[in-house]
Every structure is written in structure tokens, then in C-alpha cells.
Design a protein with these regions (language model features):
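Short, well-ordered alpha-helices that flank and scaffold nucleotide-derived cofactor binding pockets
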Residues: 31, 55-62, 179-182, 204
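Short glycine-/polar-rich loops that comprise or flank the Walker A/P-loop
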Residues: 64-68, 185-187, 212-216
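Hydrophobic/aromatic beta-strand patches that form the interior of the parallel beta-sheet core
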Residues: 39, 69-71, 190, 217
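A short, basic N-terminal segment
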Residues: 1-39, 44
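Conserved Walker B catalytic segment
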Residues: 127-195, 204-206
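Short regulatory helix/loop adjacent to the ATP-binding pocket of P-loop NTPases
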Residues: 196-214
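Conserved nucleotide-binding/hydrolysis micro-motifs of P-loop NTPases
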Residues: 36, 74-78, 164, 194-198
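P-loop NTPase nucleotide-binding core
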Residues: 43-47, 51-156
Length: 218
């Protein structure tokens, strides 16, 4: 049986050769990131936010000069879960990059030092933490951002379904995140959301911590 090459990819990462249209959006998002701007993307679910972000990350101007991270926080419901998700996905991305990157991550997260386990054959650290290990989420979050600030390349972190943080029981999560992010010089952010009303309010309502801090892509 001959191999079937289906250009209509509906799941997983979309190869560059199969990514159609969205030329203007790709160019704008890439340009904003190259200029060091944070970006908010507002679009309903299943309309291609994730594919657009990953396609942007694949652009030579980005992939050859930045460390890129994508984190989906749709299923999180608290700051503790947010930090757990962010930590686990950063580790998952860094692990294939080699021991230097993994050790940098492990040594940076001092609040978790006692909980690391190691592969008996390779000696590589393994991320086997439970949610309960993140007893000081704000401290761990600060350590993560400090690590990104010290990276030897500029970093881009895309957080999908960012509006979830407004639903956490903790009342100051937006302010906490903004407090960390505003001091970073080596890291840019993409905030993507599918709840257009809520995500728009977070970035355009006077008095909200992220008010007028980003460029917008609809």
C-alpha cells in the first residue's frame, strides 16, 4: 500500500509545508517578538492559535536565536496547578536538549531540591513530582523566571488559555505574574486565550495588572 500524505493536519504539530495562509498573522507575530514585545492572541478554540504560535516558533529568525516554550493551562484551576504545569512542561522541553539544560533547570529550582529523583542508568534527573511538592508556588514561579532571565539565549514563553488565571481562587495571580514579568529583560511572552471577553478585559480594562502591556493579535 502506498503512503498517504494528507495535507489537512487536524492534530499534533502542523509541519511548515502544510501550514496554509495566516501569512500576515505569522509576519506580525514574528515581528512583534523580534522587537521584544509581548503579544496577546484572542481567538475561539479550534481556530488555530496553537498552530500559528508553533509555526511562528519554526520561523528561522525565531528558531535559530531563541529558546521557545509552549504551555497550555486550560486544565489548571489554581496557582499551584499553574506552577506545576509550567515546571513540568519546561522540563519536558528542556530534557531532549541535553544534560547541561536539565542541570540548569534542576539547580535553578531550589525550592524543589529535595524532591528530585535520578535515573539509575543515565544519572539524569526525572520529573516525578506530585502536585503536593509545590508548597510555595510563588517561590518556585520566581525561580523559573529567574532561570529564564539567565538563559544564554532570549526566551519566548507562550501560555495558552491564559484567561484561566483570572478564575483561580487566589485573588492576586494576575498581579503576581505581572510583578515577575515586568522585571524580565531576557524573556518575551505570548498570552493566548479563547474566552475573548475575559482575555480582552484582562488586557484592556484600566486597573487590571496587564492593562496595555501587550500588542494584540485577533
Amino acid at each position: 500500500m502506498s503512503e498517504i500524505n494528507n495535507p489537512f493536519v487536524v492534530k499534533g504539530r502542523i509541519p511548515a509545508a502544510c501550514f496554509c495562509d495566516r501569512v500576515a498573522e505569522t509576519e506580525k507575530l514574528t515581528r512583534e517578538l523580534l522587537n521584544g514585545n509581548d503579544v496577546v492572541i484572542m481567538s475561539s478554540r479550534r481556530l488555530g492559535k496553537t498552530g500559528l504560535i508553533q509555526h511562528c516558533f519554526d520561523q528561522p529568525a525565531i528558531s535559530g536565536h531563541y529558546y521557545t516554550f509552549f504551555v497550555d493551562i486550560l486544565e489548571t484551576s489554581s496557582l499551584q496547578e499553574f506552577v506545576y504545569k509550567l515546571s513540568s512542561q519546561l522540563f519536558e522541553i528542556l530534557q531532549p536538549m541535553g544534560r547541561k539544560f536539565v542541570d540548569f533547570f534542576v539547580n535553578s529550582l531550589k525550592s524543589l531540591q529535595a524532591g528530585w529523583t535520578y535515573d539509575p542508568l543515565s544519572g539524569m534527573p526525572k520529573f516525578t513530582f506530585s502536585m503536593g511538592a509545590f508548597t510555595k508556588p510563588e517561590v518556585t514561579l520566581g525561580e523559573i523566571f529567574a532561570m529564564l532571565e539567565l538563559a544564554d539565549r532570549r526566551c519566548i514563553v507562550a501560555i495558552d488559555e491564559f484567561q484561566q488565571i483570572a478564575k483561580y481562587p487566589e485573588k492576586n495571580v494576575e498581579a503576581v505574574l505581572r510583578g515577575f514579568i515586568q522585571h524580565l529583560n531576557n524573556c518575551d511572552f505570548i498570552f493566548a486565550g479563547s474566552d475573548r471577553h475575559l482575555i480582552a478585559e484582562m488586557f484592556s480594562a484600566y486597573g487590571r495588572p496587564f492593562y496595555t502591556t501587550t500588542s494584540t493579535l485577533n
